[in-house]
Amino acid sequence: MAENGVWKEKGHCRQEHLTGQKKIANLYPRSFVRRGKSMEMRFLVESSLSDLAALQSLVVSTLPEVEIFMPHDEEYLSRIFQTEHSVLGVLAGEKLVAYSIIRYPGTGKDNLGQDLNLAEEDLKNLAHLQAIAVHPHFRGYGLQRELAAAHLQVLESSGYEHICCTVSPKNPVSLNNLLSCGFRVRALIPKFAGWWRYILYKGVSRSSDRPKKAESEDEIGIACSNIDGQRELIRKGYEGYSVGKTGENFDLFYRKME
């Protein structure tokens, strides 16, 4: 799961971005099979609000720790639906089993690019991968990666150049899924209710977002639970790019960008 942000009325995507999104609409609905189960990915509209809210509640109720995922109320979700192609869902039969939300924060204070000190012009071309959630019975099907990749394609088609999202350090599985989609950890700061969050960034228009290893620096692995150590690495110009497991502990591997 990934989540971030507080709703802002201003900063909806520009008309040319909406025009770009329409180019991808004919790709959905899209049918596929996972582990012998037939599924369909499609854009959701506001009539799916109650199903989405119910799935969100179920997901939150099964979390080992409440701070892993910040849920959104129905008023917030209703406003999200007002922007076309902002919500993708995966259905198994008629049952919603996963969803992804994107949002366009404009240059407001809740734009995650502010946490990365991006220029104002870049903030205007930045979108949030706001949230991804998967039904507990459908975890391990690769749906989080599938949804992230699909919504990234929507944003690329719409002309957005910068994408950000947040992930809890206590959620290494979601972190690994997003890193595999080209995101990189650029910050680690307290966000909602003081909960620690990685700020992940991806440049959509780049051919590759993989950090290049500087000749004088080696890869450094550090426990996801080591907040201070990771913040110090980030301060020194390192980016997190890969998750590994040592025994029962998850490590995030950092490399310094050239």
Whereabouts are the PLM-identified features?
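Intrinsically disordered, low-complexity, positively biased terminal segments
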Residues: 27-35, 186-258
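Conserved GNAT acetyl-CoA-binding A-motif
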Residues: 155-167
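Conserved acetyl-CoA-binding loop-helix of GNAT-fold acetyltransferases
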Residues: 134, 140-153, 180
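Conserved active-site alpha-helix within GNAT-family acetyltransferase domains
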Residues: 169-187
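A short, internal acetyl-CoA/4′-phosphopantetheine-binding micro-motif in the GNAT/acyltransferase core
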Residues: 119, 129-139, 168
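Conserved acyl-donor/pantetheine-binding loop and adjacent beta-alpha core of acyl/acetyltransferases
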Residues: 95-131
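Short amphipathic alpha-helix that is part of the acyltransferase structural core
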Residues: 26-28, 32-75, 81-91, 96, ...
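Conserved beta-strand-loop-alpha-helix junction that forms the acyl-donor binding cleft
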Residues: 165-175, 222-225
